[in-house]
Amino acid sequence: MLLSDALAVAVETLSWMEIEGLSERQALARSSNQLGIKDLGSLRLAQRLVLESTRRQNLIEKLLELADPSLTYQSLKAGPRSFARIYTYWTVVKNVDWNDAVAFLKAGRKLLGWRELAPLELTFGKLLGFRPESALTDASDSESIALKTFHPKWYVEYCVKMFGRSNAIAILNADKTPPPTYIRVNTLAEDESTIVEKMKRDGIELDKIKGMKYVYGLSRSRGLPPFSKFVRSGEIQVQDKSSCYTALAAKPKPGSVVFDVCAAPGAKTSFLAQLMRNRGTIYSFDISERRIAIWKKEMKRMRVNIAQPFLADARQSLPLNIEADVLVLDPPCSNSGTFAKTPSAKWRIKLTDFKRFSQIQLQMLNQCANQVRLGGRLVYSTCSISVEENEKVIETFLGLDPRFSLVEIEPEIGKTGMKGLSKCRRLYPQLDECNGYFLAAMIRKAY
């Protein structure tokens, strides 16, 4: 039953991801609700099947092609195509025994019908004799790296060009495994030490992150139940270390006027409010009504009472004639720093997306700059590792607007920026055990 339910959810999830471009999390939630499957064991297995088969999409498609060169994978219906990906992961990558492979195939036939899978039966049989290394025969260097690290070939070539071969391979390999889970203890709910002690009594092991106020890592082996009582009560926020870094770098003071631009779903807003001790005003802007609705729920859960939401497109003037002491901009980006957590993102983006996003980011930065008071702080962050979306955006912005200059960021974690921007900070998944990230802090000065 567990395998059948998990497989049903996984196949449906992959199909929704492909048809509507949903993320793994969105598609999994939709599929489990649609099918009425709530068993946690089945959902965990479904999540693993989805994440790991999506992570290895290029390797899996190569193995399917080798098993049957006449097979046109993209011509298959969504259901059989999704099952073929999952089956290849299960039998070749996990290297299960013959009995497990047969049981898996039987579950697939029951789910989709034997007629739907009949064109793939020969392919499925051949795959039992394959190993992942089978896909590397006659591959070029960049193709081999792409298949070994599970990335598009163009992205491998981009990383090698930007970071050098050895650093690139380290970055790419880091995407194979999601980083640790981090939490932020919410002192708007209760005293930090009290919350930490309560969690420890419940058997949750925490590691304080050096130099980062209120931020803790969770033991990889124990993890955190997704709907634990501490999350529901607002005592903690599950938030990547990199995201927490933005709020700390902003250095908001109690009583400040803060703009949080592209703010939803609200993790940064709530941390800014925490650092301000719920004193002052935060104006949070986002373009999505749906995300603003989530933001409102998050502010209530996290005990934030100084933040106001505004529906706005940050590429245009913000709808407030007020100057900010601190403005935080976390614009849309390629998400190339989050491939370990959201592997589907790496198969959606193209090289040209780096330039496309950089144009949007620069447009937003130019608009936001006009809202920062003299002596005020402007913080820019992305969860991308591309130079185009980070150093080149900042370099261009500073060239266009001499009112701003870079300042040192505290705490000083990660590495310095590229292209000589030593005051910017970069976080790398293989070094910092978090999402890939970029951060720049600037002060508005007199001309």
Features from the language model and the residues they span:
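Class I Rossmann-like S-adenosyl-L-methionine
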Residues: 1-223
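SAM-dependent Rossmann-like transferase core, predominantly class I methyltransferases
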Residues: 222-257
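Conserved class I S-adenosyl-L-methionine
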Residues: 255-262, 283
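Helix-to-beta-strand junctions that scaffold the AdoMet/dcAdoMet cofactor pocket
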Residues: 276-277, 372-374
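S-adenosyl-L-methionine
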Residues: 285-322
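Glycine-rich S-adenosyl-L-methionine
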Residues: 287, 345-373
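C-terminal catalytic and target-recognition region of SAM-dependent MTase-like enzymes
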Residues: 315-328, 332-334, 340-341, 355, ...
